[in-house]
Amino acid sequence: MKQLLFFCIITIFSICFCQFAAAQNNGVKKETQTLALGDSTVKINIYERKGARVTFVSPHHNEQIAVRLGREAIEKTGGRFVEIESLDENGNGQRRLNFSFKGVNYSLDPNRIFTENGRQCSQFAPEIEPLVKDFGERLLKIILADGARLREGERFLVAIHNNRDVDEQTELAQKSRDLTALGFSAGFAAMNLSQTEFHHQTEGVYLSNSEYDADNFVFVSTPALMSFFIAEGFNVVLQKPAAKLQIKNCAVDDGSLSVFAGLRNIPYINLEADAKFGEFRQRQMINAIYRLFYQQQRGLQQAKMKK
């Protein structure tokens, strides 16, 4: 009898604990897929919860504000967050993926592998390039349906990034390579001003009087998306259309997820924020993403009702 009572108590405790754990993560399911890269493996963590049909992607694991806010967004509002896990020897998040093949160590930027031209620009050894291509294609199949289109119910793909504070850069050459809204402006480049390294990729730039930090901006693939985020008060950068991205130039096609999406006419949004001071602003960007999703969803429903 005592054994039966003890068993019942343990069972009740286990059920309560499971219910508590489920409540703690608010229904967020975490799945980890392991992808081979040479003789090494890379963990891809996928957080998902019912709600808005939005996929967020964090390619760089050292950008911890982006990683934290991506998980937070899924927990609060739903959707899906894909995180590429990359840790150094101390267990800290790092930007690049380190891997080995046949006893030789290599390293790559996971956001420079999605196009053939981008992989060529990274100058991988001939025996490594097919391995990187295969890894990139399998990663895309996690992010997108069949690795080439939005998943059912989704309206756009969202990347989340953090960048280094441009004000911390002292040398002019360093400032020119810093990722800011100004860095995408061809007009500033024509005037030989600093911070214009990335203007080859863009069609236009909008600078908002509501934005206090040039490191905070939204990068979009279509004019319609640009209009929405302008109205929201953000700095906005518009990527070149697909026809203008088909140039075998590393300054244009760098192998990034944005270029891959642009070449395939996949609506794409990148939320960039200062790695030190951009948390509040990036959270506002994520909230705007959900407003955009539900706005587009309502528009789609209204269009169906009119038919």
Segments (PLM) and residue ranges:
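Positively charged n-region of N-terminal signal peptides that target proteins for export
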Residues: M1-L4
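Bacterial N-terminal signal peptides
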Residues: F7-C16
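Boundary at the C-terminal end of the N-terminal hydrophobic targeting segment
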Residues: C18-A23
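Structured catalytic-domain cores with a bias toward divalent-metal coordination
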Residues: Q24-K306
